[in-house]
A protein has these predicted regions:
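Conserved ABC ATPase signature
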Residues: 141-145, 149
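Conserved catalytic motifs of ABC-family nucleotide-binding domains
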Residues: 162
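Helix-to-loop junction immediately C-terminal to a conserved catalytic motif
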Residues: 55
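Conserved ABC transporter NBD signature motif
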Residues: 63-71
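Short coil-to-helix segment of the ABC ATPase nucleotide-binding domain corresponding to the Q-loop/switch region
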Residues: 100-109
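ABC ATPase NBD coupling module
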Residues: 18, 72-88
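Catalytic Walker B motif of ABC-type/P-loop ATPase nucleotide-binding domains
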Residues: 166-169
Length: 225
């Protein structure tokens, strides 16, 4: 079976000239459909940089990086956009639009992707909000939600269009244990039912048991645990 993500010998640099610094050193990794891979390691070790490269949010400088069978090194902007449309992103910052309710923030992802008719948007948004324990908060504005609730809305927004790959950067950082486990279990169910792999950056040892593999990055080098 072809891996959803295949990374071979990826190097990445920040800066120019004498200030150029290597962030990733020869990273190689395959992620199979439905596999959950956790990335751990100290801050500044390159975890988030690798995540954004896989998500076609940053240009691949050296090495090979294939997602859904498409090579991202040297890829045209149109191909990168097509790859991004098939990915669900969950970042540390929820980035909710303050003038939209929780439900409307989730619906917006469906409008942007055009994956359903307008009539089905509300039902899908309410269903995924209920799955993350926010059915009663669906029509509330972000300003009235706690930090943990806002993050759960962001997770719902990433999951609502049934992505083929989930990239998550510290998705449980602002959640208590119960809420964090609820959210990662939802992501795990999607991974196993839909064959949707997850690459998740975390410092949260409480969620290690959901992983198929746990890898560590130190000084830009990928290490097995």
């Amino acid at each position: 079976m072809q891996p959803t993500v295949s990374i071979a010998g990826v190097n990445h640099f920040f800066g120019d000239g004498s200030g150029r610094k290597q962030i990733l050193h020869g990273v190689s990794l395959d992620i199979a459909p439905g596999e959950i891979v956790l990335l751990t390691g100290p801050s500044g070790s390159g975890k988030s940089t690798l995540l954004t490269l896989v998500g076609a949010l940053r240009t691949v400088q050296e090495g090979a990086l294939r997602v859904f069978g498409h090579e991202l090194f040297g890829a045209a902007a149109e191909l990168q956009r097509a790859v991004r449309r098939r990915i669900g992103y969950i970042f540390q910052e929820h980035n909710l639009l303050p003038f939209l309710t929780a439900r409307r923030n989730v619906e917006l992802a469906l409008h942007l992707e055009r994956v359903a008719s307008d009539a089905g948007f509300e039902a899908q948004a309410r269903a995924v909000l209920a799955a993350v324990g926010l059915d009663a908060e669906a029509d509330r504005a972000p300003a009235t939600l706690s930090g943990g609730q806002k993050q759960r809305v962001a997770i719902a927004r990433a999951l609502v269009h049934r992505p083929q790959l989930i990239l998550a950067d510290e998705p449980t950082a602002s959640l208590d244990r119960a809420s964090g486990l609820q959210c990662v279990q939802l992501m795990r169910r999607l991974a196993k039912e839909q064959g949707c792999p997850i690459l998740l950056v975390t410092h949260d040892s409480r969620i290690h048991d959901i992983a198929d593999r746990i890898l560590r990055i130190e000084d830009g080098r990928l290490l097995p645990m």
